[in-house]
């Protein structure tokens, strides 16, 4: 239960509470129940970031259908080093590899400028909300990559070959090297 205790301490840090939508301190017994439920929930993934054997952050995704809501936090000593951006990028990669979801979603308070910048830098779509901002990002589960050679016939063949694709959550990437 060391992860449970770490997450409890992290969740109740002043800065984490300030950026959370639930700002009150959480009693350990409530947190312990929440943690036990999350561990059993197939729609939740939690990753603990460690450095030199010490837990320094967490990132979580809670899935509803094909969309997963992101929550993340770093302990005070780990902030300002680019780890949040790295942690969210790694989460995207793992969720894509596991086929966990096809879209990510996050809510950020208007005063949480650092998180806003992170989601913007990772290519999330930003929407203004009453509380601040919401961020969404489509993460295709696989890509179909086709090369064309500056030829409309090659491009047409590439499009025809995937037109009747029946798998969900895919994208077509067409590369054109410009040769004639």
Where in the sequence are the language-model features?
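A conserved acidic beta->alpha catalytic loop
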Residues: 161, 176-180
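Hydrophobic/aromatic residues located in beta-strands of well-ordered beta-sheets
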Residues: 104, 172-174
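Conserved GNAT-fold acetyl-CoA-binding loop/helix
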Residues: 15-34
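Acyl-donor (CoA/ACP) binding surface of acyl/acetyltransferases
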Residues: 2-4, 10-13, 50-144, 148-149, ...
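Short, acidic, metal-binding catalytic loop of nucleotide-sugar glycosyltransferases
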Residues: 160-169
């Amino acid at each position: 239960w060391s992860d449970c205790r770490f997450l409890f301490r992290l969740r109740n840090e002043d800065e984490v509470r300030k950026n959370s939508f639930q700002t009150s301190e959480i009693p350990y017994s409530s947190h312990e129940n929440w943690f036990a439920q999350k561990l059993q929930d197939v729609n939740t993934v939690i990753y603990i970031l460690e450095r030199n054997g010490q837990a320094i952050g967490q990132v979580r995704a809670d899935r509803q259908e094909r969309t997963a809501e992101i929550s993340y936090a770093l302990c005070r000593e780990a902030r300002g080093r680019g780890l949040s951006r790295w942690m969210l990028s790694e989460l995207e990669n793992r969720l894509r590899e596991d086929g966990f979801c096809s879209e990510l979603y996050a809510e950020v308070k208007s005063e949480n400028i650092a998180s806003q910048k992170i989601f913007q830098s990772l290519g999330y779509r930003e929407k203004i909300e009453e509380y601040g901002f919401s961020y969404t990002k489509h993460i295709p589960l696989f890509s179909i990559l086709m090369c064309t050679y500056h030829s409309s016939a090659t491009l047409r063949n590439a499009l025809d070959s995937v037109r009747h694709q029946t798998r969900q959550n895919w994208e077509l990437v067409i590369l054109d090297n410009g040769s004639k």
